[in-house]
């Protein structure tokens, strides 16, 4: 919802980047037709293991550089909790789940592709500290890293990509300090507390720099205190 002339999307997972590039650059109708065709050919159904394993094998036995992002999207739709998981060889290794493609998801896909095509977006898969050539004082930076004190398929270090740990957390926080000193406005999504565990690194960093904290719905929920951290006066942008 941020009004801007250009969007820059950076994700360490280059497979996610390729998927978004596909949504932007390929014809939306052709994407939809591909999904419908593959569902019919392989008789995909939510919770049914055998057809799912066939398309997963098709994806994994294709050379990495030739793997179709649309097939990855199909795997995500029918995979467990719709997660994006890879092993160290970049083979997709998520088991079958209980979800699938339906009319509601089709509407969301079409709407998302249309919106993406209307925007001026550039896609990257760089380390977050290597973005300086794309950032200036007029840039607004939003960071949504893995949450240090929660466990996800993206931050256990076993999914074919770099895991998230205290070292990475410190690197990110130091980089945001660097942006702040340059006068660049940023927003960071994170979690202060989860199941009685606190992210003391983040708490100390916020207090040291005097950054603003916004809680989702103004309160903690389900033993999980999700927050947004900003380095500017929120009232200026309301």
Language model segments and positions:
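Conserved S-adenosyl-L-methionine
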Residues: 1-41
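Class I S-adenosyl-L-methionine
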Residues: 1-8, 12, 129-135, 139, ...
């Amino acid at each position: 919802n941020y009004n801007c002339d250009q969007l820059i999307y950076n994700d360490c997972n280059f497979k996610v980047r390729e998927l978004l590039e596909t949504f932007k650059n390929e014809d939306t109708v052709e994407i939809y037709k591909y999904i419908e065709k593959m569902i019919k050919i392989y008789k995909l159904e939510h919770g049914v293991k055998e057809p799912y394993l066939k398309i997963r094998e098709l994806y994994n036995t294709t050379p990495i550089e030739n793997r179709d992002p649309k097939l990855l999207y199909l795997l995500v739709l029918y995979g467990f909790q719709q997660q994006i998981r890879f092993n160290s060889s970049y083979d997709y290794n998520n088991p079958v789940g209980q979800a699938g493609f339906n009319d509601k998801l089709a509407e969301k896909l079409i709407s998302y592709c249309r919106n993406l095509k209307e925007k001026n977006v550039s896609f990257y898969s760089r380390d977050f500290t290597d973005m300086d050539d794309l950032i200036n004082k007029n840039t607004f930076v939003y960071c949504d890293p893995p949450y240090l004190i929660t466990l996800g398929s993206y931050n256990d270090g076993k999914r074919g990509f770099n895991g998230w740990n205290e070292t990475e957390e410190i690197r990110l926080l130091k980089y945001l300090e660097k942006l702040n000193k340059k006068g660049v406005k940023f927003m960071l999504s994170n979690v202060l507390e989860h199941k009685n565990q606190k992210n003391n690194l983040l708490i100390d960093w916020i207090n040291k720099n005097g950054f603003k904290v916004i809680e989702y719905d103004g309160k903690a929920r389900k033993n999980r205190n999700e927050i947004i951290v900003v380095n500017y006066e929120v009232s200026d942008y309301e």
